[in-house]
């Protein structure tokens, strides 16, 4: 039994969902024992930048916004563990970048911030 996310239906509310998810992620960053204060502030700033960049997405890209928020959440939750799973971090960082690439033509800032977040987690063995 694993965590599976299936997307179907009307995503007009996805904008609210990604904002809520990323707000929770930003709050969770403070609980990362594997990062020092400066690193946590850097990551919190990147999460805020991602949230702002996602707001520029057209309504029909709400599903992608939600995926990006959840991938970021997965990265932070894994990094909060005493012994983060490097494979999980790498796969999640790759997924974050891949999702961002799908909207790079309409929101290039999203891809730039997603890459920075993935690079941040590379120092923990992911990406």
Predicted segments with their positions:
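Short amphipathic alpha-helical segments that predominantly mediate membrane engagement
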Residues: 1-8, 22-102, 119-127
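Amphipathic alpha-helical hairpins/coiled-coils and adjacent low-complexity
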Residues: 104, 108-111, 115
């Amino acid at each position: 039994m694993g965590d599976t996310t299936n997307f179907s239906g009307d995503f007009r509310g996805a904008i609210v969902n990604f904002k809520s998810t990323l707000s929770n992620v930003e709050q969770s960053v403070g609980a990362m024992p594997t990062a020092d204060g400066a690193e946590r502030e850097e990551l919190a700033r990147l999460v805020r930048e991602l949230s702002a960049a996602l707001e520029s997405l057209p309504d029909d890209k709400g599903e992608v916004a939600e995926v990006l928020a959840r991938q970021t959440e997965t990265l932070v939750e894994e990094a909060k563990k005493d012994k983060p799973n490097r494979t999980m971090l790498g796969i999640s960082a790759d997924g974050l970048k891949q999702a961002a690439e799908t909207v790079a033509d309409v929101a290039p800032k999203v891809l730039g911030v997603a890459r920075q977040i993935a690079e941040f987690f590379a120092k923990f063995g992911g990406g």
